A protein has these predicted regions:
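Short, flexible helix/strand-to-coil boundary loops that buttress conserved ligand/catalytic motifs
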Residues: 6, 18, 26, 67-68, ...
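ATP-dependent small-molecule kinase phosphotransfer cores
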Residues: 1-47
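Short glycine-rich anion-binding loops that position phosphate/pyrophosphate groups of nucleotides
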Residues: 35-39, 60-62, 108
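A glycine- and Lys/Arg-enriched "phosphate-lid" helix/loop adjacent to the NTP-binding pocket
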Residues: 51-93
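Short, well-ordered alpha-helix to beta-strand connector turns
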Residues: 28-29, 51-52, 98-99
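Short amphipathic alpha-helical segments
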Residues: 43-46, 66-70, 114-117
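NTP-dependent small-molecule kinase module
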Residues: 92-120
Length: 120
């Protein structure tokens, strides 16, 4: 599991592995759903921006918590001691920075999918 890898090798290993995979991705893929920590790598985000539109599904923290809980059981590529609130506050400005398009994450999954299909 991601949490086991993080415990054994550290969260920076997870982030580096994520960056390596992104940079090895060919630019002919239509949709790439990255891990949440991909946004920490300027190199990865610049690469993705070079051939695609980056879509940020802006979802309020309380709704994220409803969907995934507090994150303790979920593997998070973040330093120990950071909770989902800390991660959200740290990542949200980065998602905004890199987004070409921002969608409302409060909408239904069906509405979001329809919007994305219309965009691509």
């Amino acid at each position: 599991s991601l949490e086991q890898i993080k415990k054994n090798k550290g969260y920076k290993f997870v982030r580096q592995a994520e960056e390596d995979v992104i940079l090895a991705t060919e630019n002919n893929i239509k949709i790439i759903s990255t891990g949440g920590s991909a946004v920490y790598s300027d190199k990865s985000m610049a690469y993705l921006s070079s051939f695609s539109k980056i879509i940020y599904i802006n979802t309020p923290l309380d709704l994220i918590k409803q969907r995934i809980g507090e994150g303790q059981e979920r593997g998070l590529a973040a330093p120990d001691g950071m909770d989902i609130d800390d991660i959200y506050r740290e990542r949200e400005p980065l998602y905004t920075k890199w987004a070409d398009i921002t969608l409302d994450g409060k909408k239904s999954i069906e509405e979001i999918i329809t919007t994305i299909i219309d965009l691509i």
